[in-house]
Amino acid sequence: MAVGKNKRISKGKKGGKKKAADPYAKKDWYDIKAPSVFDIKNVGKTLVTRTQGTKIASEGLKHRVFEVSLADLQKDEDQSFRKIRLRAEDVQGKNVLTNFWGMDFTTDKLRSLVKKWQTLIEAHVDVKTTDSYTLRMFCIAFTKKRPNQQKRTCYAQSSQIRQIRRKMVEIMRNQASSCDLKELVAKFIPESIGREIEKATSSIFPLQNVYIRKVKILKAPKFDIGKLMEVHGDYSEDVGVKLDRPADETVAEAEPEIPGA
C-alpha cells in the first residue's frame, strides 16, 4: 500500500509573523501656504514620502492640487459654498507655496438656486489675463420679478436671453483681460463681476443670484519663482517673531557662592 502525504496536516510556515511596518515612518508633513489675496495663509498640512535616493520629496509635492472652502480661507461662513483649488508650485523648507488653480460651487448651493417660474441663463468665455494665464469662466444668473409685478412667472424671451448672454461674455472678458490672476481672484471673492453684470443687464431684464460659478485654468505661463513670491508676499509673517527682552527685565546672573567663605 502506497503511503501518501496527508494534506490535512498543516505544514508549519517558514519564519515568524512579519511585523507590520508603520506607513507614516517614512513620511514627512509639509505646511500648505495660500496666496496673500486670502486672509488665512496656513491652509493645512500634507504628507509626502521622505527623500530616498533619486526620488526627491519636493518633486512629489509639486503640482499637487488642494481643494479648500473659501469660508476657511476668509473666516466667513457665508462663503462656504465656494470651493477654491490651489496648486503646489514650489517647496521652500517645510512650506508648500501654492497658487490659484480654479474655483467651483458646491452642488447643494447650485441646486438651491434653481427654482420654478424663472429663467436660468448661463454663459462661458475663454479669457487671457495680463500675466498670460488662460482661463475659462462660467457665469450663471436667474430672472426675477419686476417691481409691483402681479404675474407669478418671470420668464425672459429668447431675444432677451441672447442680449443678456452677450453682456455677460463682454463684462467677463473686459474684467479678466485688464488685470493679472491675483487681481482677478480678488474680484471673485466679493462677487464684484456678478454685481456688475446684474447692474448692466437691469435695462434688459431684472436678474438675481448672478455668480461666476466656475473657473478653470486652461493654460499657465512658464513657472517664475519671482512672480510666485509676489503672489505670496511675506509668507513667513504667520510664524511667531522672536522678541528681545527689555533691559530692565533681564535677570542678573547670581554670583557663585564660595563654600566656607
Curated annotation (Swiss-Prot):
Record keywords = Cytoplasm, Ribonucleoprotein, Ribosomal protein
Any GO MF annotation of the entry = structural constituent of ribosome
Subcellular location(s) per record? Cytoplasm
- Where are the annotated segments for Disordered? 1-23
- InterPro entries (UniProt xref): Ribosomal_eS1 (IPR001593), Ribosomal_eS1_CS (IPR018281), Ribosomal_eS1_euk (IPR027500)
Listed under subunit, the entry gives: Component of the small ribosomal subunit. Mature ribosomes consist of a small (40S) and a large (60S) subunit. The 40S subunit contains about 33 different proteins and 1 molecule of RNA (18S). The 60S subunit contains about 49 different proteins and 3 molecules of RNA (25S, 5.8S and 5S).
Fetch the PANTHER family from UniProt: 40S RIBOSOMAL PROTEIN S3A (PTHR11830)
Q: What protein name does the entry list?
A: Small ribosomal subunit protein eS1
Task: Please tell me the species this chain comes from.
Answer: Nicotiana tabacum (Common tobacco)
Gene name, please?
Answer: cyc07
